[in-house]
Amino acid sequence: MRSGFLSPSFRAAAAALSALAVSGCALGPATPSWFSAEMLEELRTQQEYADFITARYAVMTGDPESAAAYYRRAWTSSPGDPGLLERATISTLAAGDAAAAIRLARGAPADAADEAPSAQLALIVDDIAEGRLKSAQSRLRKPVLGALNVDLAGFLSVWLTAVEAPQRGFSEADLLPGRRMVAGEQAALKGLVLMQAGRDDEAAEFFRQALRMPLATRDAVAALGASLQASRGKIEGARELIALSVGEDAAGPGVARVLADLDAGRKVARPKLDTRDGAAMAMFVISGTGLVRSSPELSAMRHALVLHLDPDLAAARLALADAYERQDRPDAALAALQAIPDASAWAADARIEAAAVLNAQERSAEALVMGDRALALSQRREILVRAGDLNRFNGRLDVARRLFDQVIAADAARGQSDWMVLYARATVRNESADWAGAEDDLRAALAIEPDRPELLNYLGYGWIRQGKRIEEGLALIMRAAEARPDQGYIIDSLGWAHFQLGQYDKAIEHLERAAELSPTDPEILDHLGDAYWRGGRQEEARFEWLAALDLKPEPAREITLREKLDKGLPAMPGARLASRP
């Protein structure tokens, strides 16, 4: 899917047609005598239909911005159609433009808006933002919001009730449908309500309950609860909530900020949520679940509305950026990430995510600069690992090695080890001509995950390339291939291992399969060409080498491919075995 699929010329033509069709130009001297009012009306109808079809196509091709523009234009032609209003509002919110969605819903006839769930949701958020709480509550009671928004409606209703009558709000929270999938979120909501009421001990207990259950927003909830406890001098209680949030993973950004304050002996302020902030937090908590989490469009809709209520909720901005990435809208994702200031606890996460977005766009120099900015802001484990991978993929092996060393040493100090980080460092060591060190890391990783195909494949490859333990190496690769028979790079490993052993018929069999699985991998096509050459099929070998060259391989491989096309392979098979990332 690609955002912005409509070409400038198409947009211009559509705009010109729309201007003719829907402008206020009445028939006059400039209009041909044969152009009747009925024909103008038909043109308007055709334009409306064209806008509708174009918008639907934009939705199907993953371009919410174009979909929103064309649905809104179609709505302008038929402002009484609630179905069209709903589509226009959904697309506008999916594009991340809450303000435009609110304007659209606010300008619609009341009877149309009353039948459009997303328009009602936009109006509810606008009512809360503008302090029209009774109007918001009235809208929340309307059944038009539908099953998709039932949990959200319940959370917002509880919060708005609690703002005016905390005990009644808490009682209303008890009446929410008991659904196992949102039990953690419901406990967090009760914590918010009790904190708002000043019942801090009870609030902390419900935050504790929430963190003992599955909870998508656990870092934000834990940071809130830990800050509440620390502000009251209950340091051990704060650390307990932090420990519950971390589990087997390293601390998230919100919790890490509170933990740093505790370790430094700094005073932690009591969290304060006004009506808007609390509604935003309630909405954020429930929007990390189920279908909303799995759909980038729904996620963008919800988090755009959350940020309309609280633009400073950085965790929601990260979630919005993630939705944009999944919509294949890298520029929008970068803009959202860059809006998070360096002073935010979530700044380092925003920078390292921006680095990943830039790297995916092959803007590696900018990505590395952004990765360095993330490291300057935080040395959290997740930041170190992601920065290590970023540097590894871009050839800064010394930097990657240093970062992975730091993570592995810190893990060891806690009595832990992570096979993925060991594997990453092994690849760096191997590419730095330190096979002995790479082998040590691979053995350590296999001690943790003895059946992991990636590890079996890499170690087996390395042994065969070194010309020792060849049978053991082949056995490891065969185990990897049995576990992942549809992974082209592993089947390539198996074929290349047979090639190194001089078993060219078997090599061709596996390498042909690898090429079917990964037809755009120049390394696999290069290997297949070598196997064909050794198998006496020189013309087919040249064809594969040419195909590999067309795929624009890395410079070193391009040089060897050109040499092989010029001279073929030397008389004896080479002993070098290409490494794998």
PLM-predicted stretches and their roles:
Residues 62, 96, 131, 165, ...:
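Residue-level detector of the short coil/turn that links helix A to helix B
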